[in-house]
UniProtKB/Swiss-Prot annotation:
Binds 1 zinc ion per subunit. A zinc finger (FPG-type) spans 236-270. The active site is at 2 (schiff-base intermediate with dna), 3 (proton donor), 58 (proton donor), 260 (proton donor). Its EC number is 3.2.2.23, 4.2.99.18. This is Formamidopyrimidine-DNA glycosylase. The keyword Amino-acid biosynthesis does not apply. NCBIfam families: fpg (TIGR00577), PRK01103.1 (NF002211). DNA binds at residues 91, 110, 151. The keyword Lipid biosynthesis does not apply. Belongs to the FPG family. Involved in base excision repair of DNA damaged by oxidation or by mutagenic agents. Acts as a DNA glycosylase that recognizes and removes damaged bases. Has a preference for oxidized purines, such as 7,8-dihydro-8-oxoguanine (8-oxoG). Has AP (apurinic/apyrimidinic) lyase activity and introduces nicks in the DNA strand. Cleaves the DNA backbone by beta-delta elimination to generate a single-strand break at the site of the removed base with both 3'- and 5'-phosphates. Keywords: DNA damage, DNA repair, DNA-binding, Glycosidase, Hydrolase, Lyase, Metal-binding, Multifunctional enzyme, Zinc, Zinc-finger.
Amino acid sequence: MPELPEVETTRRGIAPYLEGQRVSRVIVRERRLRWPIPEDLDVRLSGQRIECVERRAKYLLIKAEAGSLIGHLGMSGSLRLVECGLVAAKHEHVDIELESGLALRYTDPRRFGALLWCEDPLRHELLARLGPEPLGGLFDGERLFQLSRGRSMAVKPFIMDNAVVVGVGNIYATEALFAAGIDPRREAGSISRARYLRLAEEIKRILAHAIERGGTTLRDFVGGDGQPGYFQQELFAYGRAGEFCKVCGTTLREVKLGQRASVYCPRCQR
């Protein structure tokens, strides 16, 4: 599933080609995504100038003059730029054609993504209750420490809770906990302030570095320019169960937490 770095990589890839451009038409070949694409999307978006492309959590916000398109890549979705009129392949469900001659093409083999229209995206039910951005000033270790008091849930699902902080998905939660030396099974409320301060810094560092590397390509993800991400070459724990720890040589173990596979080093993480 594309996580925050993959979505931010997509945003950075498509924004220069969309911002300031006017939409000529919208072609929808398949409306049945996680939520149906609005039947009047072509009417609402055609003729409008795109003002900016932003990101909130794992959502892309394409802001036009009279509203915004909320995009989510789901499990296997991607957005890339193609020339208008390029024949669509299977699973290429939507083209947003621009007067520049380029089109933003949405591809989603599993159809778990979304393209929704609204006037004010930050008040939309999908975004209104989200926590702070992990790379912003409102997120730090003190927030993690205070919100964790009295919590018996494991620390990994705790930091993946979008009400606590957005955008820390399975890949980057696994990597941040490894870097901070924290066992993902530990009760959130049992972890000290000092360790949460370290964990928050590792979350920020790893997410920022993953964005620089273009995200993590594990299955279907490519950026807005069609290129894969390269952070998977630097993974220490995620997807490496049964392999040797790159730090101490111990065999990495896997455990299920909140229905997610969690890989950890029993020696490095306590």
